[in-house]
Amino acid sequence: MTWMLMVSCLLAVLYVGAAIWALRGLPESISAMVYVLPEGGARWLWTIWLWLVSLGTLIPVIDLLAMRGCEIVGFATMCCLVFCGAMPIFMKEHKRAHDALGIAGGLLSQACVACLAGGWSGWLWLWLLWPLLMASTLIRPRGWLGRLLQGRGCTVAEILCYVTVIGSASLAIATMTACP
């Protein structure tokens, strides 16, 4: 499991870094870049990678969340990522459903952290993050926040989702291996 976690972390860093490097800046949606790949093998490879990341890292998180009675949050996060990964195979072009699943995966992954952290600090982080993501995707804020995000809330959600899923999985693995 630790090997799978390290491979998932490396692939997430490489994928996000390659997306930012290829576009010379933050793309509107990192996972939406899969739609510029040729149909067939490249899209299947991306789908398999996202499935490996979600299934390989979220299963220990769900086990740990089950101890707190919040396993449905981890399961919903995993479902969002699995369906988001499969969409480029079945859809010919970028759709809003893909963005919605990406944002849902990002928010649900933060809810996993809030459940694992316990106490008020984890939930405070989640409720501070929610308006930021919604403002960056729906409202188009003005001022410095608008210039910074420029409607790139999907990118913010995806990066948070990758980092959080991998981070919470490492926390879950560390917690389970520390228990006798």
Regions found by a protein language model. Give the residues of each.
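Hydrophobic alpha-helical transmembrane segments of polytopic
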Residues: M4-A12, W46-V53, C70-C80, G105, ...
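Membrane-proximal helix-loop-helix units in multi-pass membrane proteins
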Residues: E71-W130
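Hydrophobic cores of alpha-helical transmembrane segments in multi-pass inner/ER membrane proteins
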Residues: L10-G17, I48-L58, L107-A117, L132-M134, ...
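Transmembrane alpha-helical segments that form the membrane-embedded catalytic/substrate-channel core
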Residues: L14-R24, V82-I89, L133-I139
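Terminal transmembrane helical module of multi-pass membrane proteins
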Residues: G118-P180
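Helix-coil boundary and interhelical linker segments in multi-pass alpha-helical membrane proteins
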Residues: M1-L5, L58-I72, A111-W125, A174-P180
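Membrane-interface helix-boundary motifs at transmembrane edges
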Residues: P38-E39, I62-C70, M91-A97, G119-S121, ...
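N-terminal topogenic module of multi-pass integral membrane proteins
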Residues: M1-I62
